[in-house]
A protein has these predicted regions:
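Terminal hydrophobic/aromatic helix or amphipathic segment near a protein terminus
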Residues: 243-272
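A conserved pocket-lining segment of Rossmann-fold NAD(P)-dependent short-chain dehydrogenase/reductase
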Residues: 174-199, 210
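Conserved beta-loop-beta element that borders a ligand/cofactor-binding pocket
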Residues: 139-164
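NAD(P)H-binding glycine-rich loop region in Rossmannoid oxidoreductase-like domains
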Residues: 40-90, 112-117
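N-terminal Rossmann NAD(P)H-binding glycine-rich loop of SDR-like oxidoreductase domains
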Residues: 1-22
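A recurrent short beta-strand within the Rossmann-like NAD(P)-dependent oxidoreductase core
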Residues: 217-234, 243
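Conserved glycine-rich Rossmann-like NAD(P)H-binding loop of the short-chain dehydrogenase/reductase
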Residues: 20-33
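Conserved Rossmann-fold NAD(P)-dependent oxidoreductase catalytic core, especially the SDR/UDP-sugar
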Residues: 86-132, 150
Length: 272
């Protein structure tokens, strides 16, 4: 498991630890951030180091039969390329194909169209993170181990608690709810025609845990090649329903609303 100290990584680690007898090799940079599973558990071994120092763990990588790769990087273009593309290729090269049964590779739903095909715009116009993920997916689809790969594509991820009291780390989306709540006094007056998908990290953990503890199944979808694709998300929820739910959560009265016209957006940007 890479990215083992992250929000999704810890939810998955906890699920696998509780629902299987698997031995977990947790690859992470800072053991102090591992809060949801005990570091001294007899079925847990820590691999402390950066994903870019892949060769340090060549022996461990050659011994595993399942890989769950959640680690990622964004912000700095060079680091994003090194972590999201170069390090992944090196990690795959150090795995033993005769022992390896499955790789669960975390990407993002932003690189696919509605037919689960790679989105050309992701490579052309995406952020450094999106572009790196799109390049890695393209290379994985052509890799000799492609038939053993399950590429998972989470939508927006909730996890942990807004107040930070959960043993699991708070996801960036959940963390942002505190800031969003400060603007409900304004948002409750507005209406917008838009929707989005989301998923909770606990649901991601259950899906990945079931994939990782059952016999690997090859991709059966026609026209997609050997690499299997799984998009993770709830049914779409509208922005208006989201604001309504947040208002109820925070005890803010819902009001009649007006459409968020372009000129109104520009006015709000200038005023606020």
């Amino acid at each position: 498991m890479t990215g083992a100290s992250g929000c999704v990584g810890q939810y998955i680690s906890r699920w696998v630890l509780d629902h299987s007898d698997a031995e977990l090799l947790l690859w992470l940079r800072d053991p102090a951030k591992l809060t949801a599973v005990p570091t001294d558990h007899p079925r847990i071994r820590l691999m402390v180091g950066d994903l870019r120092d892949t060769d340090r763990f060549a022996q461990e990588l050659a011994s595993v039969n399942r890989v769950i790769h959640t680690a990622t990087a964004w912000g700095d273009p060079e680091r994003a390329e090194q972590v999201n593309v170069v390090a992944v290729k090196r990690m795959l090269a150090l795995l033993d194909p005769s022992k390896l049964e499955q790789i669960i590779y975390f990407s993002t739903a932003s690189v696919l169209d509605r037919h689960l095909r790679p989105l050309p715009e992701a490579l052309a116009y995406g952020t450094e993170y999106i572009q790196a993920k799109a390049r890695c997916l393209r290379e994985l689809a052509q890799h000799p181990l492609a038939s053993k790969v399950v590429a998972v594509f989470p939508t927006l991820v909730f996890g942990g608690r807004v107040d930070g009291t959960s043993p699991f780390p708070t996801s960036y989306l959940t963390e942002g709810l505190a800031e969003v709540s400060r603007w409900l006094w304004l948002a409750r007056w507005l209406r917008v025609d838009a929707s989005f998908h989301f998923i909770h990290a606990e649901d991601i953990a259950r899906i990945c845990g079931l994939l990782a503890t059952r016999p690997h199944e090859p991709n059966r979808e026609p026209g997609q090649g050997a690499l299997r694709r799984v998009v993770m998300g709830q049914a779409a929820i509208s922005v208006n329903d989201t604001v309504k739910t947040l208002c109820r959560w925070r005890g803010v009265a819902r009001t009649p609303g007006i459409p968020l016209w372009p000129w109104l957006i520009e006015t709000l940007i200038r005023v606020l």
